[in-house]
């Protein structure tokens, strides 16, 4: 619902138009493209989508299939929720210990993603198999970040998702040679700085019903971001210095705003103040220093 979405994104500045686009996309549970210029929060949005689903889930620690053992619970991607064992309101001491309660998972794979991570892989020493990423992210969100920059060709990666996106189940090959069908019950998000139509053909785009552009923040949103980031960086907000920054390094340069820049520029100003051994304070001189370095090749 809209209220769930607002709560999930309460720590981000998201305008109404973006919320209204994200809501139906999340409810569909099918898949979405998040695209736009780098630094505008695509990954931050994707990371918070799972919060809108709410609550927690139970998953088996491992799966046993005809002699093959597949480890599903992964402390690297799953956050275990520890319950009271009998002293609290609910007595969970009798819960089958083969199951574990976790926060709904958000699994993020970036440019380092390889095809082997999407298949069952067996450890040759222990003979125990590792579940693929899409199995670990069931009942949550799988984010393919920096889509189009993986080492494998884009069409190879896309072909891997055609059946799961269409049928809501996936096929996995086990080391024994057996093929099994598993649920594909999750939202998959492709996040990219590139134009989707330049990456994939129309047939695949049809299977991703929601394509949402994450645009540049407005000037008002940019100012709001600075005001939020200032105390987090140890600064008091200085309207005159902020106006100087915007007038000199944005309006005069015809430079677009990016959501990441308040944080990045304030970090530069902070380092400048530490180096000069002066109080941490916004100033035109400090913003000139930060902008000259930050925008030198941009």
Task: Tell where the protein language model's regions lie, with residue ranges.
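Conserved C-terminal helix/linker of AAA+ ATPases
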Residues: 259-266, 272-298
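Conserved ASCE/P-loop NTPase catalytic core
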Residues: 6-190
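Amphipathic alpha-helical interaction segments
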Residues: 20, 24, 44, 160, ...
